[in-house]
Structure formats: structure tokens, C-alpha cells
Amino acid sequence: MCTKGNRSFEEMALSARKRLEEKSPAEIAEKSGSEYDPKNGRLKTKSLAEQVSLVLPEYSFVQEVEEWHQLVILHYLDLADHTPVSEEQITFGELKDGLIRGTKFDHDMESELAVFLKGKSEEQLYQIIKACGGEIIDSKADICAKFDFLPYYPLWLKIWLADDEFEASGKLLLSKSADHYLAVEDAVTVGGILMEKLRAVSDV
């Protein structure tokens, strides 16, 4: 049975693949921080520390990747322009066209993180972050993890642990250069995918 979600994915993926087929694979690789293997007709990239390979020219995925994760990768490869990655962090609401959808996502994510963090120890959180490909970095937050969702598309998860006065809380942030690589619709999808992975690891 073809659901509305499946149809939407298929239509958007087809459009993205057509755009990519019209471009030079070598140029796509350079602009996106990926690797082009002309001998084997493959484009290789990394998402959350995992290797992802696409068969050219149809840009089909070798590994099993969830549909909307596939679409984000295709859109990233299409939009990437090799803009240097900024270390300046912004909220989803600060993205171009992010005032409504991005701001709503920021609020929803803070609520989801509050539920996710409840009852988890600092050590548990470190283990979950590591299992999802995150890197612990210095920050004013109690815990700050950087996730390279794609080569030039980092996210930062900042966590403040619970104390006598406050419950644990968190924020998910993007790079100021994020608009050069994905539109806000895909950005919120990326945030959702990362949250799902964090939950999945914590449930194991």
C-alpha cells in the first residue's frame, strides 16, 4: 500500500536524483565534503560517523538507510556549496525561513529533551552520545556533544544536568552555515532523526 508519506518521499527523492544526475559527481563530492570513486561509480559520504555509499548515476543507496534520512542526504548533496563550516551556533528558528517552523521545532525539541534526559546519569548520556557518533567538546553547558550529521553539517547537543532546583534540560543547535547545505524543512528532519537515534540507543 502506497501511503501519502511514501508518495511524498518518492516524488521528492525522484526530483533530487534528477537534479544530481545533471551535475558533475566530482563537483558534488568537492562541495559536500564527500568522496567520488569514478572507477566503481560510487559517491561516498558519512552520516553520524557511518559510511554511506551511493551508486551513480542513479544515486541509489548501497546501505540500508531510512527513507527520510536518504532524502536529507540527497538534498544535502544537491544544495552543498562548500561554504566553510561556521563554529557559531544558532537555533533552528534562526535559520533562513525558520521563524515559524524552526522556532516551533526548537520548542518541541526542548520538551522532548526534558523527557529524554529525565533519570539518566551523566555516564549514561556519555555512552549514548558516543554510540550515536557524537564527540564531547568543551562548553559552558554540563555536557556538549558535536554530531557531524553530514561532513559540513554539524549539530551540537547541549545538556544541563538536573540539580536541586532544576530538572535536566537540553538544546539542539546548528551551525550558522547550515543554510548553505539544507533548507529548514530538511533541518528539522535532521534534528528529528538524531533524536530518534538517541532514543533508540538509550532503549537498548
What are these regions (language model features)?
Residues 28-56, 135-161:
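Amphipathic, interaction-prone secondary-structure segments
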